[in-house]
Amino acid sequence: SRKIVITKKIMEVRKSQDGISGIKVLLHIKNKSSFAFTKLNITDYLPKLVAPSKEFGTIRPTTVQRSPSGAIRVIWDIPRLERGEERIISYNIRSRLSIIGRFTLPGATVEYRNKKGRLIRVHSNRLTLLIPEEKRE
C-alpha cells in the first residue's frame, strides 16, 4: 500500500468570453503510514499554455523552473510530514491564451525516502478539462 498519497483537484475555473482565463489547483498530500517522513519534494508540472500566478495559497513553492520547451515545474519542499498528517497546497494558474477544447494538466509527484533510505516517487492523477466553445450570435 502507498504510504504517501497525492491527489490533484481543480477547485475553481474562471472563464472569460474566449474560454478559460484561470484555474485554481489543489494538491492534497496525505501520510497514511504510522511514521513521519522528512524532506518531501512535491513537483507539479504545467503545460506551456499556462503559468502559475504570483499568488500562492497555503504553501509558497521553493522554486519555479521553466524548461526550454516552455513547460513549467513548480516545486515545494516539505521538511516533515507526520503520521496521519495532511497538507493542502493550492495555487492559481492563468492561461496565456484562452483555452478552448480539451486541456490536460499533467499529474504531480511526491518524492521522499522510506525508512531504508530508498527514494520513492508517487504520482497523482492527471486532470482533463473540456472547454466548450462559446456560441456567438
Q: Model-predicted segments: where are they?
A:
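Low-complexity, intrinsically disordered segments enriched in Ser/Thr together with acidic residues
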Residues: 77-107, 112-117
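Residue-level recognition of well-ordered beta-strand positions that form the cores
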Residues: 9, 26-30, 43-45, 77, ...
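Extracellular/luminal low-complexity Ser/Thr/Pro-rich, glycosylation-prone repeat/linker regions
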Residues: 1-10, 106-137
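A surface/secretory-pathway sequence property marking extracellular, secreted
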Residues: 38-83, 120, 125-127, 132
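Extended acidic, low-complexity intrinsically disordered regions
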Residues: 1-2, 10-17, 68-70
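Short solvent-exposed strand-capping/beta-turn motif centered on an Asx-Ser/Thr pair
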Residues: 30-36, 45-49, 96-98
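Short beta-strand elements of extracellular/lumenal beta-sandwich folds
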Residues: 10-12, 16-38
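Hydrophobic core residues within well-ordered beta-strands of beta-rich domains
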Residues: 4, 23-25, 87, 103-104
